[in-house]
């Protein structure tokens, strides 16, 4: 069973398109789309464990130029 998360991303003005393209290129990212509202990009990612997710996805996302804030929302089964 894999760990899945949605990551909501705020960007600098005019950077949502380039951030979306950069995020989409990261291994483990299953979808990323520009949106309107308080966040500019919403992406979904998955990895084998939370540790793998942190190393392979989250660290790379947070290093992308133009990102000002992220909010990570783990997917749960209720």
Mark where each language-model region is.
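A compositional/biophysical signature of low hydrophobicity enriched in polar/charged and small residues
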Residues: 1-78
């Amino acid at each position: 069973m894999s760990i899945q998360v949605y990551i909501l991303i705020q960007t600098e003005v005019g950077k949502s398109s380039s951030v979306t393209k950069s995020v989409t290129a990261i291994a483990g990212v299953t979808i990323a789309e520009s949106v309107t509202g308080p966040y500019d990009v919403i992406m979904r990612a998955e990895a084998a464990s939370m540790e793998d997710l942190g190393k392979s996805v989250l660290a790379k996302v947070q290093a992308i130029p133009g990102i000002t804030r992220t909010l990570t929302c783990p997917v749960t089964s209720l």
